[in-house]
From Swiss-Prot:
It is found in: Cytoplasm. This is Acyl carrier protein. Carrier of the growing fatty acid chain in fatty acid biosynthesis. Coiled coil: none annotated. 4'-phosphopantetheine is transferred from CoA to a specific serine of apo-ACP by AcpS. This modification is essential for activity because fatty acids are bound in thioester linkage to the sulfhydryl of the prosthetic group. Gene3D superfamilies: ACP-like (1.10.1200.10). It comes from Colwellia psychrerythraea (strain 34H / ATCC BAA-681). One of its GO terms (biological process) is lipid A biosynthetic process. Belongs to the acyl carrier protein (ACP) family. Residues 2-77 form the Carrier domain. The lineage of its organism: Bacteria, Pseudomonadati, Pseudomonadota, Gammaproteobacteria, Alteromonadales. One of its GO terms (molecular function) is acyl carrier activity. It holds the Pfam family PP-binding.
């Protein structure tokens, strides 16, 4: 597991209040982990802070799964 993957999963657990076992690479934040629109905004903000990056709204809308978050961070480091 990459460092980015570990950090994204940790943020997901903290922001959504789910167990680490529930967070799979292909988990959808909304469909699988029960996030609502406010949760997803807070998740994106936490990712921005953790990885010291700015995620434009049009890109944030595409980050719907754990893998999508990892891919975005990896591509924009």
């Amino acid at each position: 597991m990459s460092n980015i993957e570990e950090r994204v999963k940790k943020i997901t657990v903290e922001q959504l209040g789910v167990s680490e076992a529930e967070v799979k690479i292909d988990s959808s934040f909304v469909d699988d982990l029960g996030a609502d629109s406010l949760d997803t905004v807070e998740l994106v903000m936490a990712l921005e802070e953790e990885f010291d990056t700015e995620i434009p709204d049009e890109e944030a809308e595409k980050i719907t799964t754990v893998q999508a978050a990892i891919d975005y961070v990896t591509a924009n480091q």
